[in-house]
Structure formats: C-alpha cells, structure tokens
C-alpha cells in the first residue's frame, strides 16, 4: 500500500449535487425549485423563526428571570480545602486561585464549615462563616479581615 494509492471506500463519498446543469442530471432547468412562486425566486424565502403569521415560538413562551447587575458572586470554599491552598501558613484569594480551588474571578470567597482543619492557618481577605471561624481558631489559626 502506498499513500498515492489510498482511496475512500466505494460508496462512502457522495458527489455534491450540481443543480441547473442540464435536463439529464435530474436537477436541470428549474434546479429542484419547481415552477414560479416565492420559493422559486432568488432573494430568500422567509425570516428565521417565521411561522406563516402564527405567533412564533420565541414569542409564545414567557420571559424568565433577569440578570442582576448588582449581584455579588460569592464562591463557597470548604474548610477542608484550606490546607491545600495555604502558602506559608496563609490562605488568601491568590492561593485559592493558584491551586485551582476557586476559578474565574469571583466577587467574594466565603469559607464554610465543611470538613475539618488540623493546621493553624491565617485566613486573610476572605469571608468566613461563624462555625468556620470557630474551627480555624480552635486549630490554632486566626482570621484577618
């Protein structure tokens, strides 16, 4: 077998339909468009979503929700994830982003009481729930706002 002899399997490729190229082709003369009428003319048929005067689907279905421009996107981080995000005993947004615990650009990060913590860590610049704050301080750490 050589590269110049490789060919696709018989019947696996279908030729493009070349319309308007003679009566013998089966798609000559009117090129599969029939005789006269809106469909036969150039310049399009109807706009996308047009349903012949019936109320279109995108207008029949009610609107839902809104995008809150004043909303604050808070990402929750479990207490058990803090130890892996600590850099020199300090946990901050930079460390969480670096370790891929938090992705994107959240408006705020909140530490919640899920799991447990064994090391005394300093949590800096993050929101902390009351339960998580107590657990951090119990482990010998501190929370700096």
Swiss-Prot record:
Q: Which PROSITE patterns match?
A: RIBOSOMAL_L15
Matching entries from Pfam families are given as: Ribosomal_L27A (PF00828)
**A GO MF label:** structural constituent of ribosome
Write down the HAMAP family for this protein, in alphabetical order: Ribosomal_uL15
The annotated subunit structure for this chain is: Part of the 50S ribosomal subunit.
Specify residue ranges for compositional bias: Gly residues: 21-31
Q: Which SUPFAM superfamilies match?
A: Ribosomal proteins L15p and L18e (SSF52080)
Q: Does the keyword Amino-acid biosynthesis apply?
A: no
**A biological process term (GO) from this entry:** translation
Q: Can you name this protein? A: Large ribosomal subunit protein uL15
Q: Which UniProt keywords apply?
A: Ribonucleoprotein, Ribosomal protein, RNA-binding, rRNA-binding
What are the start and end residues of every segment in region (Disordered)? 1-52
Q: Name one GO cellular component term.
A: cytosolic large ribosomal subunit
Membership in a protein family: Belongs to the universal ribosomal protein uL15 family.
List the InterPro entries: Ribosomal_uL15, Ribosomal_uL15/eL18, Ribosomal_uL15/eL18_sf, Ribosomal_uL15_bac-type, Ribosomal_uL15_CS
Function (record text): Binds to the 23S rRNA.
């Amino acid at each position: 077998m050589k590269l110049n002899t490789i060919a696709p399997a018989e019947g696996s490729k279908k030729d493009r339909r070349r319309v308007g190229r003679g009566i013998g082709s089966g798609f000559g003369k009117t090129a599969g468009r029939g005789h006269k009428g809106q469909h036969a003319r150039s310049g399009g048929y109807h706009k996308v979503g047009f349903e012949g005067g019936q109320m279109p689907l995108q207008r029949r279905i009610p609107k839902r929700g809104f995008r809150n421009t004043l909303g604050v996107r808070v990402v929750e981080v479990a207490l058990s994830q803090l130890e892996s995000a600590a850099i020199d005993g300090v946990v901050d947004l930079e460390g969480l982003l670096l370790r891929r615990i938090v992705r994107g650009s959240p408006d705020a990060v909140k530490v919640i009481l899920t799991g447990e913590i064994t090391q005394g860590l300093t949590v800096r610049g993050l929101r902390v729930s009351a339960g998580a704050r107590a657990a951090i301080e119990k482990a010998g750490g501190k929370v700096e706002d």
